[in-house]
Amino acid sequence: MLKYLTSFILILATNTESQPAAAQIKNTQIRMPCGSGIANYEHPSQYSFTTVNAKSSLVRQINFGAEGLKSGQLSLTFVGHSTFLIQSPENIRVITDYNDYFRADVQPDIVTMDVEGGSHSTNLISPNISYVLRGWTEALTLQRHDVTLKDVRVYNLPTNITDFGAGFSNFSSIFIIQSQGLCIAHMGHLRHILDQQQLTDIGRIDVLLIPIDRLVTQSHDELIHNIKAINPRPIIPMHFDGMPTAKTFLRDISGVYAVKRFGTHTMMLSRSTLPIKTEVLLLPPQRPGSRLRPRL
């Protein structure tokens, strides 16, 4: 009997491993967090981050192909609302909060959806997408992911957990994209102060994508508290579909961090060109507007 039971478990494990990528991963073994074992980096002495212009290596308009990317570089495009396209030198494309309203005109390899909602998720999934990572489960259980595809790793931290893990309130996830020595965190619909264990589980974060609308997310005071605890270099706002929302946030944070505005929605990232100190980089969305019709 024990022999048959062991065989059944092995078969079940094999079948689970070979499930389509769109199937939700419920018992993923989480590895070391982003940045573990990497010494604190130093910027080259000749590096100076004082101005942003069209010729800056940080703000280069690039094609969606990976031809312009070198080892150690990532491209990041603010598609709209909470959707970003992140692309690696091996042409792996990650799209955050994949939905039917704000979509890049490329086929992604990995998509994340931090919360269930019209502009944050979709059930219309191409079979060509390698991994579909949702930040929630219908059964209200913890959803953990940790996947690697070529030179890109994506993992998550469930958030908004109440009742000591027994229930959820607007259950969501922070998704971390790790590639080329960079760690990028998409904060999703985080609604609380992160504790020390959560900060440890997230790991070192170089680039932080933050919601600024205060509607179903953190207040600006809570947001600034979490930014200080995470200590990223660039902070890139999301969850704004018009300048009034952005202006309110910039007013609240300008006394804490320097603010730089960009004229392009795509930027090049590398560890050597990160700002020395934490600062806000405001990118215009590629597809602005909160009332777009679904792109099916």
Predicted feature descriptions by range:
Residues 13, 76, 165-167:
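Generic marker of residues within folded, mature protein domains
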Residues 4-15:
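Bacterial N-terminal signal peptides
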Residues 235:
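Residue-level signal for inorganic ion chemistry
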Residues 19-159, 184-186, 206-210, 243, ...:
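Metallo-beta-lactamase
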Residues 238:
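A Lys-centered signature of the CheY-like receiver
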